[in-house]
Curated annotation (Swiss-Prot):
Basic and acidic residues bias: start-end ranges: 231-247
Polar residues compositional bias, start-end: 171-182
Region annotation (Basic motif) ranges: 234-253
A Pfam cross-reference name: bZIP_C
Cross-referenced InterPro entries: Basic_leucine-zipper_C (IPR020983), bZIP (IPR004827), bZIP_plant_GBF1 (IPR045314), bZIP_sf (IPR046347)
Organism of derivation: Oryza sativa subsp. japonica
Gene3D superfamilies associated with the record: 1.20.5.170
SUPFAM superfamilies xref list: Leucine zipper domain
UniProt protein name: bZIP transcription factor RISBZ2
Length: 425
C-alpha cells in the first residue's frame, strides 16, 4: 500500500542550503526586482516551450500557493538560479514547470497591496485553499491507477504528485524550479516557508492518505472480485467435473468389485463340488483297495484248493494205472471150471454205473484176495475222486466200467472157486 509522507519527515540535507543573509536595505531594494524576475522567469520559461503539458487543478493551486507564500515573505531575495533547478527530494531533483502569466504593473501593484492584508484572514484563506488542493489531489489519485508499491516513491506530497504525471508527459521548455524560488529568499524566510507548509499540510495529508488507502483497498477488492469471478467459475467447473469423474470411477470400481465377488462365489461353489467329488473318489478308491485285498486272499485260497485237487487227482490217476495189470492177470488165468451156473451167474451180472458199488466190491476183494496189493482208501480221497469224475463229465466212463466189471467177475471167480470146490468135495 502506498504511503504518503509529510514534508516534516523530510530531512534537512535534501534541501539546498540557503545563501548567506543580506542586509535589510539591500533586501528592500531588491524586493520588487526579485518578484519581477521570478515572475518573468516563470513566464519566459512557460512561454519558451511551445509544447508545455497541461496542468491539473491541483498543480495550479499548489503553484498559486507557492507564489502567494513567496510574496508574503518579508525579505525576498532573488537567486541567480531561480530559472534552473528543481525540488530536491528522496528520488533526486524534480523539475517543476511553474507556468505563470505575464505580470503587468497592475499585478505588481496588487501583489504589493496583498502584503498589507490582515495576516489572520490571509492564513485562513491559505488554509482553505490548501484543503481544496488536498481534496483535488485525493480525487485525482482516486481517479487514476496507482501501482501497489513504488520502491523509489518521493517523501513529500509534491514529489508524489509529480511522480503520478508519468514519463510520457514530460515537462518541456525552460521550467522555473520551485526549489530556487524557495531558496531564493534569505535563509530564515526559506525555512519559515517550509515550516509553514509543513504545519498546514500535516493534518490534511494524514486524512487524505487514509482516504487514499481506503480507496485503493476498495479498488483492489473490486478488481479482485471482477477478475476472480471467471477464475472462481473455472474452479467450480473443474471441481464439478472432478466430482463427476470421481463418482463415475467409484461406480465403475463398484461394478467391477461386484463382478469379481460373483466370480469368487461361483468359483467357491465349483470348488466345493470338486471337493465333494474328490472325497467320493477317495472313498471309492479305499473301498476298491479293500476289495482288492479280499480278492487277493480269495485267489490264494483258490490256488491252494486247486493244488490240493491236483494232488488228489494225481493219486487217483496212479490207482487207475494198476487196473490194466489186474486185467492182464485175469486173462492169464483163463482155465477155470465153467459150469452153467457160473456162466449164468456171469451173464447175469449187471453192470452198474454206481462207483460206490465198485468201491465196496473192491474192498471185499482187497480183504479176501491175497494176490492183490492193499489199496488204501479214505472218505476224503473217495470224495475227491467222485468230484473229479463228475467234473470230468464222465468222459471215458464206459471203458473204465468195463474194466471194473471184468475185474469184479475175476474176483468173484477167484473167491468162489475155493468155496465151490470145498462144497463139492
Amino acid at each position: 500500500m502506498e504511503r504518503v509522507f509529510s514534508v516534516e519527515e523530510i530531512s534537512d540535507p535534501f534541501w539546498v542550503p540557503p545563501p548567506p543573509p543580506q542586509s535589510a536595505a539591500a533586501a528592500q531594494q531588491q524586493g520588487g526586482g526579485g518578484v519581477a524576475s521570478g515572475g518573468g522567469g516563470g513566464v519566459a520559461g512557460g512561454g519558451g516551450g511551445g509544447n508545455a503539458m497541461n496542468r491539473c487543478p491541483s498543480e495550479w493551486y499548489f503553484q498559486k500557493f507557492l507564489e502567494e507564500a513567496v510574496l508574503d515573505s518579508p525579505v525576498p531575495n532573488p537567486s541567480p538560479r531561480a530559472e534552473a533547478g528543481g525540488i530536491r527530494g528522496a528520488g533526486g531533483v524534480v523539475p517543476v514547470d511553474v507556468k505563470q502569466p505575464q505580470l503587468s504593473a497592475a499585478a505588481a501593484a496588487a501583489a504589493t497591496t496583498s502584503a498589507v492584508v490582515d495576516p489572520v484572514e490571509y492564513n485562513a484563506m491559505l488554509k482553505q485553499k490548501l484543503e481544496k488542493d488536498l481534496a483535488a489531489v485525493a480525487m485525482w489519485r482516486a481517479s487514476g491507477t496507482v501501482p501497489p508499491e513504488r520502491p523509489g516513491a518521493g517523501s513529500s506530497l509534491l514529489n508524489a504528485d509529480v511522480s503520478h504525471i508519468g514519463a510520457p508527459n514530460s515537462i518541456g521548455g525552460n521550467a522555473t524550479p520551485v526549489q530556487n524560488m524557495l531558496s531564493g529568499p534569505s535563509g530564515g524566510s526559506g525555512s519559515q516557508l517550509v515550516q509553514n507548509v509543513d504545519v498546514l499540510v500535516k493534518q490534511p495529508t494524514s486524512s487524505s492518505s487514509r482516504e487514499q488507502s481506503d480507496d485503493d483497498d476498495m479498488e483492489g477488492e473490486a478488481e479482485t472480485t471482477g477478475t476472480a469471478r471467471p477464475a472462481d467459475q473455472r474452479l467450480q467447473r473443474r471441481k464439478q467435473s472432478n466430482r463427476e469423474s470421481a463418482r463415475r470411477s467409484r461406480s465403475r470400481k463398484a461394478a467391477h468389485l461386484n463382478e469379481l465377488e460373483a466370480q469368487v462365489s461361483q468359483l467357491r461353489v465349483e470348488n466345493s463340488s470338486l471337493l465333494r467329488r474328490l472325497a467320493d473318489v477317495n472313498q471309492k478308491y479305499n473301498d476298491a483297495a479293500v476289495d482288492n485285498r479280499v480278492l487277493k486272499a480269495d485267489v490264494e485260497t483258490l490256488r491252494a484248493k486247486v493244488k490240493m485237487a491236483e494232488d488228489s487227482v494225481k493219486r487217483v490217476t496212479g490207482m487207475n494205472a494198476l487196473f490194466p495189470a489186474a486185467s492182464d492177470m485175469s486173462s492169464l488165468s483163463m482155465p477155470f471150471n465153467s459150469s452153467p451156473s457160473e456162466a449164468t451167474s456171469d451173464a447175469a451180472v449187471p453192470i452198474q454205473d454206481d462207483p460206490n458199488n465198485y468201491f465196496a466190491t473192491n474192498n471185499d476183494i482187497g480183504g479176501n484176495n491175497n494176490y492183490m496189493p492193499d489199496i488204501p482208501s479214505s472218505a476224503q480221497e473217495d470224495e475227491d475222486f467222485v468230484n473229479g469224475a463228475l467234473a470230468a463229465g464222465k468222459i471215458g466212463r464206459t471203458a473204465s466200467l468195463q474194466r471194473v466189471a471184468s475185474l469184479e467177475h475175476l474176483q468173484k471167480r477167484m473167491c468162489g472157486g475155493p468155496a465151490s470146490s470145498g462144497s463139492t468135495s
